[in-house]
UniProtKB/Swiss-Prot annotation:
Entries under InterPro entries matching the protein: Smg (IPR007456)
Pfam short name (any one): DUF494
Source superkingdom: Bacteria
Record protein name field: Protein Smg homolog
Family label: Belongs to the Smg family.
Taxonomy of the source species: Bacteria, Pseudomonadati, Pseudomonadota, Gammaproteobacteria, Alteromonadales
Length: 158
């Protein structure tokens, strides 16, 4: 499923190509690209749920609340999915104002919906990028996250 999300993001969303509204046509294209139908439906459902997070009457993620820094206590299930490196990265993103508590919760929500046994920091970075892309007014945070994702390490590697 995550491979399909990456494919869609890189080929349609991130490249600013016009996204087809016809889900059947998009599904056919993904099948031709070699993806399995059940995984395609899971990925499309994941994207629909991401879009639904903006509907404040359903999930009040985008309702403005207090902006003070809050320590996030993770559930056992979240700790099993998000290793210490991923959780530390989320905290880092909050500290540099790429994420706020609202977008952090959106990221965690989307991570927990990914149907994959393995999830790593690189996957986390892509989920953050997808979430920020879909939140109005987060263009600067998206650009900053894009820089973090694609920047090459400087200096010699030891």
């Amino acid at each position: 499923m995550f491979d399909i999300l990456m494919y869609l993001f890189e080929n349609f969303i991130h490249s600013e190509t016009e996204i087809r509204v016809d889900q059947d046509e998009l599904t056919d294209e993904l099948v031709r690209a070699g993806f399995h139908q059940d995984e395609i439906y899971k990925a499309l459902s994941w994207l629909e749920k991401l879009a639904a997070l903006q509907e404040t009457d359903i999930n009040p993620y985008l309702v403005k609340g207090p902006t003070s820094f809050v320590t996030r206590i993770y559930t056992h299930e979240e700790e099993m999915r998000l290793d210490i490196e991923c959780r530390g990265f989320l905290m880092f993103l909050e500290q540099i104002n790429v994420l706020d508590s609202t977008t952090r919760e959106m990221v965690i929500d989307r991570v927990m919906e990914i149907d994959s046994k393995e999830f790593c920091l690189e996957d986390m970075k892509w989920v953050v990028l997808m979430v920020l892309f879909n939140v109005p007014g987060k263009e600067n945070a998206y650009a900053q996250m894009e820089d973090l994702l694609f920047e090459e390490p400087e200096g010699p590697l030891h």
